[in-house]
UniProtKB/Swiss-Prot annotation:
Lineage: Eukaryota, Metazoa, Chordata, Tunicata, Ascidiacea
Species per Swiss-Prot/TrEMBL record: Styela clava (Sea squirt)
UniProt keyword list: Amidation, Antibiotic, Antimicrobial, Cytolysis, Hemolysis, Secreted, Signal
Role this protein plays: Exhibits broad-spectrum antimicrobial activity against both Gram-positive and Gram-negative bacteria. Has potent hemolytic activity.
Signal sequence, start to end: 1-17
Entry-annotated residues carrying Leucine amide: L52
Name under which the protein is recorded: Clavaspirin
Length: 80
């Protein structure tokens, strides 16, 4: 009787360990997916900024006029 209970207990723990491994794999897939979504959103925001001229730090074309120092400033619409 003790042997049967011990065998059933070992088999039961093996099944639980397998389901735990499967849930860890699913969690890793989900976190990897969320990471790739966040990474993609970052790229999208960067490319929208490039298209709108946010990356043009040294040529004074960021929504403003040229200054006396060759436009070496970041401009926004309030500094005109």
């Amino acid at each position: 009787m003790k042997t049967i209970i011990l065998i059933l207990l070992i088999l039961g723990l093996g099944i639980d360990a397998k389901s735990l491994e499967e849930s860890k794999a699913d969690e890793e897939k989900f976190l990897r997916f969320i990471g790739s979504v966040i990474h993609g959103i970052g790229h999208l925001v960067h490319h929208i900024g490039v298209a709108l001229g946010d990356d043009q730090q040294d040529n004074g074309k960021f929504y403003g006029y040229y200054a006396e120092d060759n436009g070496k400033h970041w401009y926004d619409t309030g500094d005109q």
